[in-house]
Amino acid sequence: MEYKFIEALPPLLYDTFVKKHKHCHLLQSAGWGEVKSNWTPYLTALENEEGDIVAAGLVLARSFPLGQSMWYLPKGPVLDYENHAVRDAYLKGLIAFAEKKRVTLVKIDPPIVRRSLMLEDYPGTTDPRAQEQIEALEALGYIHQGLSLDLESTIQPRFSAITYNTADFYEQLPKRTKRFIRDTENRFVTVSREGREGLEDFAFLIRQTEENKDITLRDQAYFEAIWDAFGDDTYLYMARIDVVYALEQMQQQLAEVNQKLEDLPPNTPKKRRQLVIQQESYQKQIDFFNERLAEEGQHQIVAGALGVEYGHVFELLYAGRNTVWGRIPAQDSIYVMSMQEAFERGMTSVSTGGVPGTLDDGLTKFKASFSPHFVETIGELDYPVKPLIYRGLVTAINLRNKLARR
């Protein structure tokens, strides 16, 4: 069969194909090309003899000094990798297009799964077909960049936490997660979906997270760009607290405990100890809430998360929390609510993003709270369109990225 490589597919046709594909991913959407304003997007595709689209790829192009440039396909291209004719035709067409544009290197990040397991089932075994795909891509001239475990070696993480839609999603959550949700409710925190007007408060939470973890994330303008690109498919969840209402409820609870202590018979020391512990806990919380009320007023932000629905998947992109409310585990409530609502809308899965491949850090432990599979893909492959200067450009890019992380 003959195939035709398409250098510029209209966005509507492009998204129609990608949204229905089993390898659908937000980072391969036409909208993501709009969000990445410091890259030039190309919506490429492959067409068969009947005129049907059989492969697609969002190419992000970036220029460097001395006329050099890189193309990058995050989590792409989108195609059936078991159909070798389609795979090879698209990837060869991509390189021909890159040569035409005088690109230095092309970097792909195929959604080929090497391993997909619950945390407790790791390391398990890898899919032998993944290695076969690597070898087939290498035969086309692509250079595999290895199976790195850290987050810094690749542009997008090789390991992602993905929770799948099941009928018993909530029942299968760890007891710890359910306890944290109850704890958040008992602290009178409310979680709800908000509109675009909540982005300013969300950006505040992200700044708090950046300062607390000494990392650089994104600013409000970037979140606005996401909203511009995806509109009603953008979901912002915020956890807030009415401190005055919370104080009223806790003072009432404390009064009830005090009354129980007064009414308690003298020969019940065990029950008295339990009530005294409750009394001290309520008083400690009341003191803290009074401090917060004096400093920040009645209505305060606790935590938030921003996600986007694309095709049949929901991607939780960013999350942050107010460090002064760090004792309230509101993020668990936000994540679970966003997942439940996504599944009710028919989403097949929710991704909470990348984790280190060692699977032994705090980020992995947190994301494991939502019963995900930790999905490992084969990672990046480079095609040196200009072999003589390819290594020099890669070295320069890596050095720049290393300096940017300091």
Where are these regions (language model features)?
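Active-site/acyl-donor-binding loops of N-acyltransferases
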Residues: 7-8, 119-168, 344-406
